[in-house]
Amino acid sequence: MKKLILSSLCMLMGLTSMSAQTALQNEILEVAHRTNNYFMTKYSDPTLDTFVKKVRTSNLWTRAVYYEGLMALYEIDPQQRYLDYTDKWADYHKWTARGSVNDTDADNQCCQQTYMDRYVQTGGKKDLSKVKENLDHQMSTKRVNYWTWIDAIQMAMPAYAKYAKITGERKYLDYAMNSYKWSRDTLANGLFNKKEGLWWRDKDYVPPYKEKDGSNCYWSRGNGWVYAALVRVMETLPKTDKYYQYLKKDFISMSQAILKCQREDGYWNVSLVCPANYGGPEMTGTGLFLYGMAWGVQHGILPRATYQKAMDKAWKA
């Protein structure tokens, strides 16, 4: 899942001393180029369906996450081919959520985050009418209980936040936050363990469910998705916004918990506090945790002295 680290690589660019910065920047860009070139070569036509166990259209969530990374790479390495590749993909899918404009599955809404990135990059020259229709449809149901698994927070929440920033209409952000709070505090008495700073994946993993060693079950990748979502939503908000402050508290709490879970080799376990369950390093969570920590240090939320060693270990991993 190296494509998930593109955003992490971009975040690391500003985290070194001046003496080492150029060398590390070159290394990061080389890895980013190699990773992305592999992907764009292997999937040279971004409109073609994907196949992992079954055929799926190419605007599914796994591809959508790749384009999030590609947009981040473009910010530090503005190559026109990145935009051409993205626009060919978005044009083919008619700048619409996967499935239909009435789809409420967060996985199928994720692609809209990149549609909005391209809208901003082009000064409003891309059509977001289907994005608006999709978000409005879900909001019209008056339900905030769609995000029943924590991955959904990353797949959908930033889309509402981005659209709120583009349009200036607060209702989209309000809806996103109400949905987040439902997953956080209400579903199965809350999927976020405030005492431990980590998330259960869904209602099936909250206590009394336990790992074989008696510990709580916190999946690395799911917590990584939430961690990244907090970053992506906070990026759309001024620091004075009440929602920024709310999410910042969760971000700090998660950061402290994630730091404690890091393995000596720089990775994180599949099950964060139970190394025996699917034992061994887990790449997606590691990449997402590195991304979040790097962002937090860059923005003065996390102390460099506390997190630099962990980031260095994660990068080497």
Residue spans for each PLM region:
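Sec/Tat-exported extracytoplasmic proteins
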Residues: 39, 43, 70, 74-77, ...
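Extended ligand-binding clefts on enzyme/binding-domain cores
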Residues: 150-151, 161-272, 279-290, 302-317
